[in-house]
């Protein structure tokens, strides 16, 4: 059972998400918060698998709440998905940089929302094409700094390769097909790279891949 905490200041939005999620046998909404501070408090009490976090909320915004949840060692297994009205919301990139595992537009189709919650709970990144473009634009304006490139030092050649492929958006199955190995082998390399880089999930690996220049704008 995947447990979900809803954080949005609009009661109707929360009700809609709850109705959809609770209709699934493997998903259950365990709590609702109308502001960021309440989201942090409930996350600590309920320790859900996934938090669907609106960015713009009173008392404490979703960006700050995401940062606090991600920074809490007791909530290491909690994954935050930020919600926004527009795909290129100015805060989306910052939310991902602060530890969010992914991003959803509020008018996402129900089937996509369900897939997203399950994917993030399984440890996958959730980056839409629009957000990926935003990442590319952000890092296209930067030059690689020695400190950033130095993050790759602990990685083996294979781990660097898998980091680059994750940065390009490939799934474990797709990488396994390319390498002609099992998905389990790929997962081992991904997990080792995450551990060495201190990354919580694949979304963070994507950030590192671009930040270090391992993946460049225009690469496919």
Please tell me what each predicted stretch does.
Residues 8, 54, 84:
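Active-site residues of response regulator receiver
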Residues 13, 53, 58-59:
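The feature encodes the CheY-like receiver
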Residues 35-38, 59-67:
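Acidic catalytic/metal-coordinating carboxylates
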Residues 46-52:
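Active-site beta3 strand of CheY-like receiver
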Residues 92-97, 102, 106-157, 161, ...:
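Short, flexible helix-to-coil linker/hinge segments that flank and couple to helix-turn-helix
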Residues 169-204:
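Recognition helix of helix-turn-helix DNA-binding domains
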């Amino acid at each position: 059972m995947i447990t979900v905490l809803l954080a949005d200041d609009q009661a109707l939005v929360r009700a809609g998400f709850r109705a959809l999620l609770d209709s699934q046998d493997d998903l259950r909404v365990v709590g609702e918060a109308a502001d960021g501070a309440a989201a942090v408090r409930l996350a600590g009490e309920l320790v859900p698998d996934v938090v669907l976090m609106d960015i713009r909320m009173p008392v404490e915004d979703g960006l700050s709440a995401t940062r606090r949840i991600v920074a809490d060692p007791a909530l290491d297994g909690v994954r935050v998905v930020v919600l926004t009205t527009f795909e290129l919301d100015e805060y989306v990139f910052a939310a991902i940089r602060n530890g969010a595992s992914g991003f959803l537009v509020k008018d996402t189709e129900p089937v996509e929302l369900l897939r997203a919650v399950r994917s993030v709970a399984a440890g996958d990144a959730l980056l839409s094409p629009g957000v990926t473009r935003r990442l590319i634009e952000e890092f296209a304006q930067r030059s690689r700094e020695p400190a950033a490139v130095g993050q790759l030092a602990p990685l083996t050649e294979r781990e660097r390769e898998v980091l680059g492929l994750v940065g390009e958006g490939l799934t474990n199955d797709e990488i396994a097909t390319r390498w002609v190995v099992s998905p389990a082998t790929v997962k081992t390399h991904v997990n080792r790279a995450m551990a060495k880089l201190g990354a919580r999930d694949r979304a963070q690996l994507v950030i590192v891949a671009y930040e270090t220049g391992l993946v460049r704008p225009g690469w496919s």
